[in-house]
A protein has these predicted regions:
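Acidic, mature catalytic/reactive cores of soluble proteins
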Residues: 1-140
Length: 140
């Protein structure tokens, strides 16, 4: 999900993914392969074992948080997450200009952001007066 509106941290551009184990243990491969300045700039990488990875080029940076040990090869960071039944894991991809602090979001913050996002979109759709494609718009 991408938090909607001006929620808890409007200065941060993030995409969140929740991985929830239902049955069996599933291994996810997580890859980050950013292309800065239309692939004209190479990233400088910093690894944060057990927490995530950051790629920076010039004044731009992306950080992928998620309790993953990454390995960087060329312009790509790859790691793995195992999710078992009843387990919930989060990934948060964050873009910032001039990223400095390493601040992984906690599970509570991510859960609250999900709740806020759902509430935002429910309020938005409640005002939708579209006819014809309303069901498709609502579902999306």
């Amino acid at each position: 999900m991408m938090p909607g509106g001006s929620l808890r941290r409007p200065d941060v551009n993030r995409i969140h993914r929740r991985l929830r184990g239902v049955s069996g243990t599933v291994r996810f491969r997580v890859t980050l392969e950013p292309r800065f300045d239309y692939a004209r700039r190479e990233a400088t990488w910093s690894l944060h074992p057990g927490s995530g990875v950051r790629a920076v080029a010039g004044s731009e940076g992306v950080t992928l948080y998620g309790g993953v040990d990454f390995a960087v090869n060329g312009g790509r960071a790859t790691g793995f997450i195992d999710v078992s039944p009843g387990e919930t894991r989060w990934l948060a991809l964050e873009y910032r200009e001039r990223p400095t602090l390493w601040r992984p979001p906690g599970a509570r913050e991510l859960d609250e952001t999900l709740d806020d996002t759902i509430a935002y979109w429910r309020r938005w759709i409640s005002r939708c007066v579209m006819t014809g494609y309303r069901e498709a718009v609502t579902r999306s």
